[in-house]
Amino acid sequence: MRILCLHGMGTNSKVLEMQTSALRHQLSHSQSHKYEYVDGGEPMPPAPGIEAFIGQDESLAYYHPHSAKSILTAIDDLWEYIAEEGPFDGVLGFSQGASLAAMIIARAHHSDPPPFQFAIFFCAGLPYCEKSLSAGEVKFLRAEATQGPVIHVPTAHIFGKKDPDVSYSKAMTELCHPWGRVLLDHGAGHEIPRVPVETVDDMARAVEKVVTKAVIGQ
């Protein structure tokens, strides 16, 4: 399956490849996927702890989180990329990448088929309300402001209780249809753990469950 991979703010695709290396290795034993990475187009200072791995000129984001114009441009650019380079079976997003993936799915929630058959969210940031963005207002999309779920494809929500922003990841789950949700708290922080092997196994099983739900539709 083709999986589009979207990195976090202040990193890049090479960092996401490194972050997911153990998980992808574990998944290769049971499932065959092709991972395709897209870099953000906005320069951004490196995320905490990333400075040792990438230079200032390599540190990117998809959008500036306080700019409605920047966020809308990121949605439009990725929408166009998917139309030109797709179809993709699934999407994997970390932090800001997960937020952007959710905004793409939310934009297309009446589309058949949807842009992705499943989504894998790591330490997800909340998506923004596109209607508010169009009015120049940066406002999170929250379940209490929507009439039911806006994401109807199977979703894996993998986060850590030590993440200072874990409340956003948990709020993201409420935007997704309950039948397709798979939740996993890996117990760590704002990261995709590569050790211990038991945690990697747990994450792989969560992804496998979501892919299976997408394939069999239940």
Swiss-Prot record:
Residues at the active site: 95 (charge relay system), 163 (charge relay system), 190 (charge relay system)
A GO cellular-component term linked to this record: cytoplasm
EC main group: hydrolase
Source species: Fusarium mangiferae
Recorded coiled-coil stretches: none
Protein name: Esterase FPY3
Keywords, ordered alphabetically: Hydrolase
InterPro entries: AB_hydrolase_fold, FSH-like_dom, LovG
Induction cue: Expression is induced in the presence of 6mM glutamine.
Single GO MF annotation: hydrolase activity
Superkingdom classification of source: Eukaryota
Function field: Esterase; part of the gene cluster that mediates the biosynthesis of the gamma-pyrones fusapyrone (FPY) and deoxyfusapyrone (dFPY). FPY is an undecaketide and thus likely synthesized by the polyketide synthase FPY1 from acetyl-CoA functioning as starter unit and the addition of 10 malonyl-CoA extender units by successive Claisen-condensations.
